[in-house]
Design a protein with these regions (language model features):
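Surface-exposed, secretory/extracytoplasmic low-complexity segments enriched in Ser/Thr/Asn/Gly/Pro
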Residues: 233, 270-271
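Short, solvent-exposed, Trp/other aromatic-anchored flexible loops in extracytoplasmic proteins
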Residues: 139-163, 240-269, 277-279
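Primarily secretory-pathway and cell-envelope proteins
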Residues: 26-130, 154-235, 240-241, 250, ...
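A surface-exposed loop-and-adjacent beta-strand signature within N-terminal beta-sandwich domains
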Residues: 128-141
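C-terminal motif of bacterial Sec signal peptides marking the signal peptidase cleavage site
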Residues: 19-22
Length: 294
């Protein structure tokens, strides 16, 4: 028996689409029917001026463009898989007063020259234009040699709620910056606001849409379950589909569209059921998108 591959359209992604291997029927597992909603909202909105920085929290080069700075010259830190020094980013949601390790590691076969490394955390201040405010943490370590993965230093996440800029820099003996990595983290959860719906029913094909109205990115696959309302009970409809295994990261303020076939469905009330992960919240949410076949 042939299995149809799900068609997909990509809209508003922030650049991370991880292609895995093979196909799967991807069962969603046990679903708590009482927890199914078409829209989920959590948290309070941060200042709108922070949104571009939150969206690019894991993207050093995009942050550099926002700040008008130069990053990842390849002089010392890994860039485009050059054999240099690897690093971990301090990005996304971090709990207040938690301790975070700043790690470095040798990448490839090169032996980077020992250098001075500076770690800086400063608060971003909102306004018409976001600006870099007070320096909260600054640590300088001389003569850093990198071999295996090791903890360069540890930092404590500030208690004051806000959005913060993290800098990891290599320096010359005179203090000139030769290479720089930037990221953004925040110790208050950005607003989560997701809506799931079915639209554009042509009689043979419809489109499910995930709207990210919030301020934090979410991740999901293209798999879903289809259910039909029958005698007061939602019953799963078997799907003759092979879902391609991919992970999609959807930025705040964007939407994702995916077409699916409805030509073989009898008249009645249906819903799509789909699970979305919200990494900043450390939770998964199962959403429903009702629709009618007339």
């Amino acid at each position: 028996m042939k299995r149809r591959l799900v068609k997909r359209r990509w809209l508003g992604l922030i650049g991370l689409v991880v292609i895995l291997t093979g196909c799967t029927r991807a069962p969603l597992g046990d679903i708590n029917q009482e927890d199914l909603f078409s829209r989920v909202e959590r948290g309070e909105a941060l200042e709108a001026s922070f949104e571009p920085y939150i969206n690019q929290a894991y993207q050093p080069e995009a942050l550099a463009e926002l700040l008008g700075e130069e990053v990842l010259t390849g002089e010392w830190f890994m860039n485009n898989n050059d054999d240099q020094v690897g690093y971990t980013l301090l990005s996304g949601y971090k709990e207040k007063n938690s301790t975070q390790a700043i790690q470095l590691f040798a990448y490839g076969e090169s032996e980077p020259e020992p250098t001075t490394v500076r770690v800086t955390i400063s608060q971003l201040e909102s306004g018409d234009d976001v600006s870099e405010g007070e320096v909260i943490t600054e640590v300088t370590i001389d003569n850093v040699e990198v071999a295996d993965t090791f903890d360069l230093t540890t930092v404590t996440i500030p208690e004051l709620e806000g959005v913060y800029l993290y800098r990891l820099e290599s320096l010359t003996p005179t203090g000139e910056v030769t290479d720089r990595v930037l990221s953004v983290f925040y110790n208050v959860l950005p607003k989560l606001d997701l809506a799931f719906e079915v639209e554009h029913d042509t009689g043979t094909e419809a489109t499910w849409v995930l709207h990210n109205h919030g301020q934090t990115s979410v991740t999901f696959g293209v798999d879903y379950a289809l259910e039909k309302y029958d005698d007061g009970v939602w019953r799963e409809v078997p799907l003759d589909l092979a879902f391609i295994e991919i992970a999609v990261q959807l930025a705040a303020g964007e939407r994702y569209d995916n077409d699916f076939s409805v030509e073989d469905l009898a008249r009645g009330e249906y819903r799509l059921v789909k699970t979305i992960q919200a990494p900043d919240y450390g939770e998964s949410f199962t959403l429903q998108a009702p629709f009618l076949i007339k």
